[in-house]
Amino acid sequence: MATYVVGDLHGCFDELQLLLKQVNYNPAQDELWLTGDLVARGAKSLECLRFVKDPKNNAKTILGNHDLHLLATLLGIKKVKPNDQVDAIFAAEDRADLQNWLRNQPLLIQHPKYGFLLTHAGISPEWNLTETIACAREAEAVLQSGHYADYIAQMYENTPDHWSAEWQGIERWRYIINVFTRMRFCYADKRLDFACKLPVEDAPNELKPWFKLDNPLFHQQDIIFGHWASLMGKADKPNIYALDTGCAWGNHLTMIRWEDKQIFTQERLK
């Protein structure tokens, strides 16, 4: 049995199939894990959702920011972004089932055997492992509740930018969501920054990648994330794995086989 983890799909379904073919993926024996953002920029977002949802493929995903935005558009809260190719999802007969399935996906997974943490964007530099897991479960419970639309409608803000255990309600939930699905850079005092999307080498000096801040968890724990395509798979820490390599933007899709840490890639199809 092999454990495979793939970076952000963004609708790149054909590339995923070719990547799985490289390793002769066998869902009866192997596991497939994904870093979220199944949808949006590629042409086959619907196919990606259906593939991951189908139990026979033995695939599990976490939620990314584009997945949450899809939920917001399906709810009529937000408009589809000009470059998002999701019309087929809106027209699909199984749209309601896909929507309900998607909102029931986790924000964080800890692998039951290997213990690595799988998250879309990252983990707060202000949390330990217990807090990280508890905050994920708390935010997931809201998404899986009957009033999740009310929270999604208030999701699109950048505050609060720091953590306090005293936060309650939407402020607390929004911080958790932003950490798991949107975060890239932080200030030295661990406040989140949402303005900078530059490669690390081009970022202002006062900003650091979240995983470069002082937190014992970032040294002790294997962490796999996506979201940050401009890293091109380079986190420069032996236990931190960045898997989004911008397939939807013309680069390639990346997959790691966890048992031996071998990397497999598939170039974007023309």
Swiss-Prot record:
The reaction(s) this protein catalyses: P(1),P(4)-bis(5'-adenosyl) tetraphosphate + H2O = 2 ADP + 2 H(+)
EC number: 3.6.1.41
Presence of keyword NAD: no
Molecular-function annotations in GO: bis(5'-nucleosyl)-tetraphosphatase (symmetrical) activity
Keyword Hydrolase found: yes
Enzyme class, broadest EC rank: hydrolase
Matching HAMAP family: ApaH
Record's protein name: Bis(5'-nucleosyl)-tetraphosphatase, symmetrical
Organism of origin: Actinobacillus pleuropneumoniae serotype 3 (strain JL03)
Gene (UniProt): apaH
